[in-house]
Structure formats: C-alpha cells, structure tokens
C-alpha cells in the first residue's frame, strides 16, 4: 500500500513538474513594444492570442533566444508550438549570434559597430566609446578601458548634469568598479569623462525573465550591445 502511494505521489510530482516546465517554456519576454501598453521585460504566454491593432508592433524573445516580431493588425498566438522541451542554450546562443549578426549586418541595422572592441567579460561597461551597454538586473557596474592606460581623473554625470561624481582610475588597470553610491538607473544616458575623453553611455538593465544566455544575447542584439554579445559567445565556448 505504501509503495503504491509513493508511486502515485511520484507520478503526480512528475506531472506537476513537467507542466510547470511547459508553462515556463511557453513564456515570451517583451523586448520592445510600440503603440501598446507592454513594458520591456514583461512576460506573456506565447500559446495565447495577442491582439494587435494596426500600427502596433511587439518584439519578443523565446526561451531559445528566438526573436519574434509581430505587426498589427493581428490576433495570433506568438509561439503556439512552444512546449516543454529542453533548450540547448549554448547551441541556441551560437546559432542566434551567427545568424542575427550576419543578417543584420547585411541589412545595415546592427546597432553598434562591428569593429568595436570586445570586452574580456560580457558585463564590463566599455567607457571609451559612445553607445548602449547591457547589464543583468542588480549587477555591479564595472567600467572597462581596453589596454589599461595611465592614471586618469574620471567624472560621471547624467545627461542633464543634475549631479556629478568624481573618482580616479589607477594606472595600469583596465577596470574601475563603481560603488553603490553612484545612482545609475536603467535606460538612462550618462556622460563619462576619462582624462580628456568624454563619452555618452546608455545603460540598459536586462530583466530577470531574460534567464539564459541565448535570451540575453537576443536581448542585447536588439538594443545594440553587440560587442557584449560576442563576449558572451566567447565565454560560452
């Protein structure tokens, strides 16, 4: 009797686990939405119809890193065939980066130059050039400059110059960790001066729903953090 009970309990637990996995796999994450009240980072069920009116546009990411772009008018399910299958994250990441960067380069729509330096770690913030940098949610900000360099005075300010932080970059080091006292915010542009060079850097935080490297790569390709995508691919090999 006890053995039968344990067997039934195990089957029930397996069914619940598989059902939860399938539900998670069907979730898509919003990257961008125009004309409709969907926030970046929001999750939607890909198996259910998404009503879009004329002119409304939504860009979504699947758990495998697939980028799904929908244009209204439409009332279709974004990913009706999403199931509970296991995602090969490394394989999906390699395929995504290869295909998306090649396709977008041909179309001239990659946000960020292809020859920009690739950071040795994906989440280092390159402050030597203008552009967008991506970070996981609640990840510490670490500035990076290729090749290190000499001692340099550093200033950080929001675009409206409402505050200013001063610090020092030591000679021979390529990284400068920022403390929690520097109030950096998501999707805000900051003017950063290192020595005599000034750049404008926009920080974009990836939501927790972007939960694997294939999804992170897809997100970063869409917002323009291309060198970081290449670094992520190198780290996954």
Regions found by a protein language model. Give the residues of each.
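Bacterial N-terminal signal peptides
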Residues: 8-17
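Sec/Tat signal peptide C-region and signal peptidase I cleavage site
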Residues: 19-25
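Extended, polar beta-sheet/loop recognition surfaces of beta-rich domains
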Residues: 147, 196-237
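Surface-exposed, short loops/turns at beta-strand junctions within beta-sandwich domains
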Residues: 179-191
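Solvent-exposed serine/threonine-rich low-complexity stretches and specific carbohydrate-binding patches
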Residues: 159-178
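Short proline/glycine-enriched turn/loop motifs at strand-loop junctions of beta-rich domains
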Residues: 55, 146-152
